[in-house]
Amino acid sequence: MSDEPSVFADTEEGDTAVTQGRTITEADVTNFAGVSGDFNHLHTDAEHMGESMFGERIAHGMLVVSAATGLLWQARSPEEREAVVAFYGIDDLRFRQPTYVGDTIRVETEVLETRSKDEGPGNGTVRTAVEVRNQRDQAVVSCEMTTLLR
């Protein structure tokens, strides 16, 4: 049995956190389109989107999710980062509001469930409610993320 502290053991249902903010930039949208191959006019055609219900181009939903996971990673301590064994997945993903170039997002989380694991790598899984909010305090993305921790 290890005497090292366990991040999993210290994680409790109801734990909450809020990350710092991050502004979604023109470069983010352009680079994400290139990396993902998603050149949909929603993200790339300013003239077309100016006449749409959104009034301007919107950021890719998965770009916002990716930026949110980055903010969550940056918010972890070195010990918490070392304790991450695997990212298991995302459930109940919803895009609540559009995110525009220039919007600043932050992530709010609450631990919903911890589940011990008897075998294999890691001590257990943590299921977390995740809400991405913009500078107007609107929820733009919501989901549940599950992570395997030591």
Regions picked out by a protein language model, each given a short descriptive name:
Residues S2-A59, W73-Q74:
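Catalytic strand-loop segment that frames the active site of acyl-thioester-processing enzymes
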Residues M53-E56, S66-V111:
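Hydrophobic beta-strand-centered segment that forms part of the acyl-chain substrate-binding groove
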